[in-house]
Amino acid sequence: MPMQGAQGRLRGSLNATPPTTPHSGLAGNQTGPWCLEVSIPDELFLSLGLVSLVENMLVVAAIAKNRNLHSPMYYFICCLAVSDLLVSVSNVLETAVMLLLEAGVLAAWAGVVQQLDNAIDVFICGSMVSSLCFLGAIAVDRYITIFYALRYHSIVTLPRARWAIATIWAASVVCSTLFIAYYDCTAVLLCLVSFFLALVVLMAVLYMHMLARACLHARSIARLHKRWRPVHQGLGLKGAATLSILLGSFFLCWGPFFLHLTLIVLCPQHPTCSCVFKNFKLFLTLIICNSIVDPLIYAFRSQELRKTLKEVLLCSW
């Protein structure tokens, strides 16, 4: 039936798992009694998406309102908020359309839904790639701030920041289009996974180096005041906790999704991998949770931004 075809297509290239072959000896739904499938209610999924949408819209509004926040660092944070906003919107839109399909409301529009599916998939993939890129850009920006403080404004200029932002958005559109067009190509999946792993390594190295530099700086200051141990230990624990939250939330929210892509390449027919495939909606939910956490880590810790956010909220009332 056309409606069934459209609905299957709407599930998207992103969560498409390779079909089982007659030679595998494994039925499509046979994963063993030990397989745990976490069911995510549509209401919860939509609610998280709406929370992320509102939260990131507030970040964008606050940065747009306050001219003091019109700097490269906040431009990157604003673009991260836009990317996270698009992640939420696209996933919420896809879920809403699927619910309408299941209810039969869009049965007469199957052809339009198929075209909408392509646009939504590109939207989802592009926003994910751009979100990851801007997380990396923020890490690089903070690294330059600490290690090249005196030269920061000559290195990270507004024109260069705008070029970097434009390049990231353009690359995200190209990557998402290629991924949706060639989602069944092993090389494309491996490129995405490699990109994620490279970004994890980059962020870990940069932030750990920044933490080491901060501890060394605190040690130097504490020696001058002859109270090295308590100050150094306190800063080290606080920095380690911040680093753990930053990298931990990033890996926890994004790791399962890229594990899913990796297993599609490595073991598409294995029962254990098939069990992982069943939890794809959980992985998307974790990515939306990351869109909720990002403003808390990168935006709302700024006193200036929080002050502007209060003004935005008061004006809205």
UniProtKB/Swiss-Prot annotation:
Residues 1-37, 94-118, 184-191, 267-279 are extracellular. Glycans are attached at N29. GO terms for cellular component: plasma membrane. A lipid is attached at C315 (S-palmitoyl cysteine). GO terms for molecular function: melanocyte-stimulating hormone receptor activity. Keywords: Cell membrane, Extinct organism protein, G-protein coupled receptor, Glycoprotein, Lipoprotein, Membrane, Palmitate, Receptor, Transducer, Transmembrane, Transmembrane helix. The keyword GTP-binding does not apply. Residues 64-72, 141-163, 212-240, 301-317 are cytoplasmic. InterPro entries: GPCR_Rhodpsn, GPCR_Rhodpsn_7TM, Melcrt_ACTH_rcpt, MSH_rcpt. Residues 1-28 are annotated as: Disordered. The chain crosses the membrane at residues 38-63, 73-93, 119-140, 164-183, 192-211, 241-266, 280-300. Gene3D superfamilies: Rhodopsin 7-helix transmembrane proteins. SUPFAM superfamilies: Family A G protein-coupled receptor-like. It is a multi-pass membrane protein. It holds the Pfam family 7tm_1. It is found in: Cell membrane. PANTHER family: G-PROTEIN COUPLED RECEPTOR. Interacts with MGRN1, but does not undergo MGRN1-mediated ubiquitination; this interaction competes with GNAS-binding and thus inhibits agonist-induced cAMP production. Interacts with OPN3; the interaction results in a decrease in MC1R-mediated cAMP signaling and ultimately a decrease in melanin production in melanocytes. Belongs to the G-protein coupled receptor 1 family. Receptor for MSH (alpha, beta and gamma) and ACTH. The activity of this receptor is mediated by G proteins which activate adenylate cyclase. Mediates melanogenesis, the production of eumelanin (black/brown) and phaeomelanin (red/yellow), via regulation of cAMP signaling in melanocytes. This is Melanocyte-stimulating hormone receptor. It comes from Mammuthus primigenius (Siberian woolly mammoth). The lineage of its organism: Eukaryota, Metazoa, Chordata, Craniata, Vertebrata.
